Protein backbone atom coordinates (compact mmCIF):
# COMPACT_ATOMS: atom_id res chain seq x y z
CA UNK A 1 0.00 0.00 0.00
CA UNK A 2 2.85 2.37 0.86
CA UNK A 3 4.62 1.67 -2.46
CA UNK A 4 1.36 2.33 -4.29
CA UNK A 5 1.03 5.69 -2.53
CA UNK A 6 4.60 6.59 -3.48
CA UNK A 7 3.96 5.62 -7.11
CA UNK A 8 0.74 7.66 -7.22
CA UNK A 9 2.63 10.65 -5.80
CA UNK A 10 5.23 10.30 -8.57
CA UNK A 11 2.51 9.97 -11.22
CA UNK A 12 0.75 13.10 -9.94
CA UNK A 13 4.06 14.98 -9.99
CA UNK A 14 4.70 13.95 -13.59
CA UNK A 15 1.12 14.86 -14.55
CA UNK A 16 1.68 18.38 -13.16
CA UNK A 17 4.71 18.78 -15.45
CA UNK A 18 2.79 17.49 -18.46
CA UNK A 19 -0.12 19.86 -17.75
CA UNK A 20 2.32 22.76 -17.36
CA UNK A 21 4.03 21.90 -20.64
CA UNK A 22 0.70 21.60 -22.47
CA UNK A 23 -0.41 24.96 -21.06
CA UNK A 24 2.80 26.68 -22.22
CA UNK A 25 2.60 24.99 -25.64
CA UNK A 26 -0.99 26.22 -26.06
CA UNK A 27 0.05 29.78 -25.14
CA UNK A 28 3.02 29.68 -27.54
CA UNK A 29 0.76 28.43 -30.33
CA UNK A 30 -1.70 31.25 -29.57
CA UNK A 31 1.16 33.75 -29.66
CA UNK A 32 2.30 32.46 -33.07
CA UNK A 33 -1.26 32.70 -34.35
CA UNK A 34 -1.65 36.22 -32.94
CA UNK A 35 1.60 37.24 -34.66
CA UNK A 36 0.39 35.81 -37.97
CA UNK A 37 -2.88 37.72 -37.57
CA UNK A 38 -0.87 40.86 -36.72
CA UNK A 39 1.05 40.54 -40.00
CA UNK A 40 -2.31 40.33 -41.77
CA UNK A 41 -3.47 43.37 -39.74
CA UNK A 42 -6.28 41.36 -38.11
CA UNK A 43 -5.15 42.03 -34.52
CA UNK A 44 -3.42 44.94 -32.81
CA UNK A 45 0.12 45.05 -31.50
CA UNK A 46 -1.30 45.27 -27.96
CA UNK A 47 -3.05 41.91 -28.42
CA UNK A 48 0.24 40.32 -29.54
CA UNK A 49 1.99 41.89 -26.53
CA UNK A 50 -0.71 40.50 -24.24
CA UNK A 51 -0.27 36.98 -25.68
CA UNK A 52 3.51 37.34 -25.27
CA UNK A 53 3.15 38.42 -21.63
CA UNK A 54 0.94 35.38 -20.91
CA UNK A 55 3.61 33.10 -22.43
CA UNK A 56 6.39 34.64 -20.38
CA UNK A 57 4.36 34.39 -17.18
CA UNK A 58 3.58 30.69 -17.76
CA UNK A 59 7.21 29.88 -18.63
CA UNK A 60 8.49 31.68 -15.52
CA UNK A 61 5.98 29.75 -13.40
CA UNK A 62 7.36 26.48 -14.81
CA UNK A 63 10.94 27.63 -14.20
CA UNK A 64 10.11 28.40 -10.57
CA UNK A 65 8.47 25.00 -10.15
CA UNK A 66 11.64 23.47 -11.63
CA UNK A 67 13.73 25.23 -8.98
CA UNK A 68 11.53 23.70 -6.25
CA UNK A 69 12.03 20.06 -7.31
CA UNK A 70 13.52 18.68 -4.09
CA UNK A 71 11.16 16.54 -2.03
CA UNK A 72 11.45 18.81 1.01
CA UNK A 73 10.60 21.90 -1.10
CA UNK A 74 6.98 20.73 -1.16
CA UNK A 75 6.77 20.66 2.66
CA UNK A 76 5.61 23.13 5.27
CA UNK A 77 8.34 24.69 7.41
CA UNK A 78 9.45 25.93 10.80
CA UNK A 79 10.85 29.46 10.73
CA UNK A 80 12.85 30.71 13.72
CA UNK A 81 14.00 34.31 14.19
CA UNK A 82 16.58 35.36 16.81
CA UNK A 83 17.47 38.98 17.46
CA UNK A 84 21.18 39.68 17.25
CA UNK A 85 23.53 41.93 19.19
CA UNK A 86 22.18 45.44 19.48
CA UNK A 87 19.57 45.22 22.21
CA UNK A 88 16.25 46.94 21.65
CA UNK A 89 17.17 47.91 18.07
CA UNK A 90 17.77 44.30 17.03
CA UNK A 91 14.73 43.09 18.95
CA UNK A 92 12.60 45.61 17.05
CA UNK A 93 14.15 44.41 13.77
CA UNK A 94 13.35 40.79 14.68
CA UNK A 95 9.76 41.86 15.35
CA UNK A 96 9.56 43.53 11.93
CA UNK A 97 10.85 40.36 10.28
CA UNK A 98 8.26 38.28 12.15
CA UNK A 99 5.42 40.51 10.94
CA UNK A 100 6.83 40.45 7.42
CA UNK A 101 6.94 36.63 7.29
CA UNK A 102 3.46 36.38 8.83
CA UNK A 103 2.07 38.71 6.15
CA UNK A 104 3.90 36.77 3.46
CA UNK A 105 2.40 33.52 4.73
CA UNK A 106 -1.07 35.05 4.88
CA UNK A 107 -0.83 36.50 1.36
CA UNK A 108 0.18 33.09 -0.03
CA UNK A 109 -2.64 31.24 1.72
CA UNK A 110 -0.36 29.56 4.26
CA UNK A 111 -1.38 28.90 7.84
CA UNK A 112 1.00 30.53 10.32
CA UNK A 113 1.16 29.39 13.94
CA UNK A 114 3.50 30.88 16.57
CA UNK A 115 4.74 28.01 18.72
CA UNK A 116 7.22 30.02 20.83
CA UNK A 117 7.63 33.76 21.41
CA UNK A 118 9.92 35.62 23.79
CA UNK A 119 9.25 39.36 23.97
CA UNK A 120 12.06 41.89 24.02
CA UNK A 121 12.97 44.00 27.07
CA UNK A 122 11.54 47.32 25.83
CA UNK A 123 10.20 46.59 22.35
CA UNK A 124 10.25 43.87 19.75
CA UNK A 125 11.06 40.21 20.31
CA UNK A 126 14.11 38.24 21.39
CA UNK A 127 13.09 35.05 19.62
CA UNK A 128 10.12 33.51 17.83
CA UNK A 129 9.42 30.11 16.33
CA UNK A 130 6.64 29.90 13.73
CA UNK A 131 5.17 26.95 11.91
CA UNK A 132 4.17 27.87 8.38
CA UNK A 133 1.90 25.26 6.83
CA UNK A 134 1.13 25.11 3.14
CA UNK A 135 2.17 23.67 -0.20
CA UNK A 136 5.84 24.47 -0.94
CA UNK A 137 6.22 26.82 2.06
CA UNK A 138 9.73 25.46 2.71
CA UNK A 139 10.69 25.73 -0.96
CA UNK A 140 9.74 29.40 -1.10
CA UNK A 141 11.21 30.35 2.29
CA UNK A 142 14.43 28.30 2.43
CA UNK A 143 16.43 31.11 0.82
CA UNK A 144 15.62 33.31 3.84
CA UNK A 145 18.13 31.33 5.95
CA UNK A 146 20.89 33.54 7.29
CA UNK A 147 21.56 36.85 8.98
CA UNK A 148 19.40 39.83 8.04
CA UNK A 149 20.74 43.35 8.56
CA UNK A 150 18.90 46.66 8.89
CA UNK A 151 20.60 50.07 8.89
CA UNK A 152 18.37 52.97 9.95
CA UNK A 153 18.18 56.07 12.10
CA UNK A 154 17.17 54.60 15.43
CA UNK A 155 13.86 55.66 16.99
CA UNK A 156 15.32 54.41 20.31
CA UNK A 157 18.47 56.54 20.21
CA UNK A 158 17.98 60.12 21.49
CA UNK A 159 20.99 61.32 19.46
CA UNK A 160 19.37 60.19 16.18
CA UNK A 161 22.36 58.10 15.14
CA UNK A 162 22.29 55.47 12.43
CA UNK A 163 22.23 52.01 13.93
CA UNK A 164 22.84 48.60 12.39
CA UNK A 165 20.62 45.79 13.63
CA UNK A 166 20.96 42.07 13.04
CA UNK A 167 18.60 39.12 13.28
CA UNK A 168 19.15 35.52 12.24
CA UNK A 169 16.55 33.44 10.44
CA UNK A 170 16.53 29.63 10.35
CA UNK A 171 14.11 27.77 8.07
CA UNK A 172 13.72 23.99 8.28
CA UNK A 173 11.22 21.65 6.62
CA UNK A 174 8.34 20.46 8.77
State what each model feature region is.
Residues 6-174:
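A conserved glycine-rich
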Residues 1-3:
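Short amphipathic helix-turn modules centered on a small-residue break
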Amino acid sequence: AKRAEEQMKKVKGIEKWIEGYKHVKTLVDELALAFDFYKEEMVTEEEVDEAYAKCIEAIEELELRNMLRQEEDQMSCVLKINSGAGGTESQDWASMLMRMYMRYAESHGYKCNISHLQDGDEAGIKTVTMEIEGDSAYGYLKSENGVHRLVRVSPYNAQGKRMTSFASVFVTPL
